[in-house]
Amino acid sequence: MPTINQLVRKPRKSKAKKSDSPALNKGFNSMKKQFTDLNSPQKRGVCTRVGTMTPKKPNSALRKYARVRLSNNIEINAYIPGIGHNLQEHSVVLVRGGRVKDLPGVRYHIVRGALDTSGVEGRMQSRSLYGTKRPKK
């Protein structure tokens, strides 16, 4: 344990906070071929693979996910929320942060109802989260 004198001479350093979604905090300068710091809430990307994954231990399901190459050339795994989707290889999607707790390596969500992703059909509640238009009366 340090003495007060030692702490006065060299104070404690606080830990730097790590980002939960690091791929959204990078931009890519294609002229210089180098990364820049550029925080963004969402990024556009192209699906390179669409498939299913099994969750961690107590849960059992086939969770839909897509491998996405973002506009900054970083490849990530992104979860496809909701029931049913129209995504396939080369679909252009919008990606936001937010991990899926029972899927290791999935730290991003695809935004439903944006770009090539359709909204969830027949959804009546929480429609804005799933990109569903208001039903006609």
From Swiss-Prot:
Residues 1-28 are annotated as: Disordered. This is Small ribosomal subunit protein uS12. Gene3D superfamilies: Nucleic acid-binding proteins (2.40.50.140). GO terms for molecular function: rRNA binding; structural constituent of ribosome; tRNA binding. Keywords: Methylation, Ribonucleoprotein, Ribosomal protein, RNA-binding, rRNA-binding, tRNA-binding. The modification 3-methylthioaspartic acid is found at D102. InterPro entries: NA-bd_OB-fold, Ribosomal_uS12, Ribosomal_uS12_bac. Part of the 30S ribosomal subunit. Contacts proteins S8 and S17. May interact with IF1 in the 30S initiation complex. One of its GO terms (cellular component) is small ribosomal subunit. One of its GO terms (biological process) is translation. NCBIfam families: rpsL_bact. Belongs to the universal ribosomal protein uS12 family. With S4 and S5 plays an important role in translational accuracy.
